[in-house]
Amino acid sequence: MKFNLWTNHGAMNSTPVFKAFEIGARKLGHDVVHNSTDGVDVIWSVLWHGRMSKNQEIWDKARLQNKPVIVIEVGNIKRGVYWKIGVNGVNRDAYFAPTGFDGARRFMLDLRVKPWRDNQDGDILLVTQHDKSEQ
């Protein structure tokens, strides 16, 4: 398989992550090109703003052609250490991996589920992404 890494449109912190993706892909026998029109597109984020705004054109074209897009994004767990990688998104719409995992990774990362807390102080404000994002 050939992967096309759109490194020109990545966030400032994307360089080492794109490089790690490339090293891993090559170790598995895949070809890698950069900022080309050949191969499976790999973009940084589905936030269409700033440096990453040009990724929207890549995303839209691939989705219209029914081609997958691999999306890399900052992770929710240990930000700056772990990264999200999904096919056709990074959150609710993405495909991440086969189901049926036993949950051992949670223990490996020392993640603990805490009990729900009631808020006695009033409302909770949820702030979501803006209109320049597919998230």
Go through each PLM region and give its residues.
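Catalytic core of nucleotide-activated saccharide and alditol-phosphate transferases
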Residues: 37, 41-135
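N-terminal pre-catalytic "stem/leader" segment of glycosyltransferase-like enzymes
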Residues: 1-53, 133
